[in-house]
């Protein structure tokens, strides 16, 4: 069986290949899940991490916080060099930021807010954790690519990312922030963990930590703003595209249809693959060529249902004559676009195309495998796209209703499918085993204009048939084939023969010429029938081969169905076992929830206790520093006191040394004797002063009694004068008046004398003290033979009054003092009293008497003067002259001698 080879076609270059050729100097990022990191990569990361931790332990400054600052400086330098004023910040490319004054001000404000309102420990923890995680994700291709790898990638690549992320967070939280004592065991000499770290590393850590948090926050905010604007732009483009499709549909419906088939309502650009639609229709082949082309064509038929273009992505949907069968595209008439073959092939399943021997099997397998691989790689990015698309759908559902263009498109597609489906065919892997579908597939490989002409010819033949069996059979075959080139030519010739025979039968003319012509026409018809028979034989053989092939495919499909049933049964068994395990797991989960509640209660109590313990541990260093400052201040005070004590000790030692020298140079016995003498003298003076005070009190008491007595006597005298009367009373009254005046004068003298007495005497009597520092003085003058000159003694005047009254006179002041001293010290030699004081023994040991009649109580007594006169010197003067530096005698040995 001869088959015509396909004419050579120029090889078309795919648009993707052209785009790849244009990307000469563009840097391209590696695809997700492309390579597995080598162990050397992890060794480098671990070495870098250990180096940074060691530097932090030695200096107290975290050098990893300088990395965001370095990124910002590098981005600024690149933006200045590129001078791209329309550069947009994205999460995937943060170095492409548009550095302006506003951007720098916003970044500085964000850093300042983080520095002021976040605690230092939390700030350093967040900054360090973010830097290490960001650095690791940066080496893995970016934050989004790492998340996509974790979600949709292989376990060999996702597990290291999860493990390293958890390790960084746990290490920063539980070892570097909360448990310095653990690191002290490894670094005992580090000042950072001992609690005495300097101030400047902590300040720098807080500063760069604030920048490490504030700068990424601004980048993410700007990126989200960019993505939101991009989403709004895409949404607007979608609305405009739907509106254009609606208008284009109205325009197409208003124009006359040039072919039978579904109408394309979708607007699309004129691309390289769309040039097919601008070419003129292909001419009909010769009958033999059509048969050979049909023999080379698989028994499938398809029609283009529509091309839907949205946002630059062109997708094609094809339907088969049975029920939306897939397009094969190997016909010789080139009735489908060039790229429809690959686009239709990419939808099939690889396992369902094992028995297909077409020319595009290998290309289909390549494209399908590459499509599956691309879908596997783009799993993580598709999640993000799905999130954005779901958000866009939600916004469109809330704010806008569905457009009528989409409803009209869906309804039109449903109508097209209903018009072109056949109830006899069954869809199995895009192929059918019926002869009708085969002939229809051959008919569908021709242009629409040829099909319309053939259909019209077949309708004319059916109308002009006269009931002959072979004519009806030929017309039925022509109507059943619909676009075969051989049948079309035979239909035209046979219609002309029928017309001529009908004319001859109608006119009843039996002409030899007409019969000869009819004979020739019958011969030509016989030859055409023979050629048609050969065509049918070829078709029968072709259908037999197709039947064998389809039977093989059916057996293969049955085997696959059996395998799928076995697999389904195994899956059902696994499902039952999974249900049983799930029930057990739920029971265990309920038990674990109860245990979890108990453990959480105990854990909360332990956490509180640990927090208290850790807070105390954290405050130990501060308490130690505070205690150290207090001890230093106390040490300074004690040093000052010690210095003063040393000075006083040196002074006392010098004095002690002087006293020892004085003790060695002088006699102690003579000093003790002089000290005893001074003590005795002071004791005597105290006793004499006490006696004088008592005497003065008794004297003032007697004075008061005497005044009362005088007043009573004056009253009696006045009464007596009133009784006696004249002369006698006058003389006596004068006498009494003179006596009274003298008595009053004496009383006044006594009062002035008492006013000049010592303050101790006034205070003893309860009178005010006029002069606090006046020396004690007593007036001892007496008119009646007193040995002292000056003022009159009150004792003498009182005695004279009492003598006149006939009573005994009170003792004299000096007599009382002398009696008191005599009682205490013993008999003392007395002087003889003058006349008027007979029988009264007096004692006066005071020699230094003032000229006005006053004497001092603490003067040297006469006995002491007499004792000193014997030796020829005054002992008090000798004592004052011989007194040394510290009150001791200067020359005790000479004194004793």
UniProtKB/Swiss-Prot annotation:
Protein name, as recorded: Macoilin
Role: Plays a role in the regulation of neuronal activity. In AWA and AWC neurons, plays a role in regulating olfactory adaptation by controlling the forgetting sensory responses to odorants such as diacetyl and isoamyl alcohol. May play a role in regulating daf-7 expression in ASI neurons in response to bacterial small RNAs. In ASI neurons, promotes dauer formation in response to pheromones such as the ascarosides ascr#2 and ascr#3.
Biased composition (Low complexity): 452-467, 475-490
Residues that span the membrane, as ranges: 113-133, 157-177, 181-201, 204-224, 379-399
Feature: compositional bias, Basic and acidic residues: 510-535
Pfam families: Macoilin (PF09726)
Tissue occurrence: Strong expression in many neurons, very weak expression is also detected in others tissues.
Compartment(s) of residence: Rough endoplasmic reticulum membrane; Nucleus membrane
Membrane topology value: Multi-pass membrane protein
Keyword Transmembrane helix tagged: yes
Gene Ontology molecular-function annotations: microtubule binding
Coiled-coil region: 503-726
One example of a Gene Ontology biological process annotation: thermotaxis
Organism field: Caenorhabditis elegans
Keyword terms, alphabetized: Coiled coil, Endoplasmic reticulum, Membrane, Nucleus, Transmembrane, Transmembrane helix
Main localisation: endoplasmic reticulum
GO cellular component, one term: nuclear membrane
Biased composition regions of type Polar residues, renumbered to the chain: 291-304, 329-338, 403-413, 432-451, 734-761
Region feature Disordered, mapped onto this chain: 291-375, 403-535, 724-770
Ranges of compositional bias, category Acidic residues: 351-361, 414-424
Gene name of this polypeptide: maco-1
Disruption phenotype: RNAi-mediated knockdown results in defective avoidance behavior in response to P.aeruginosa.
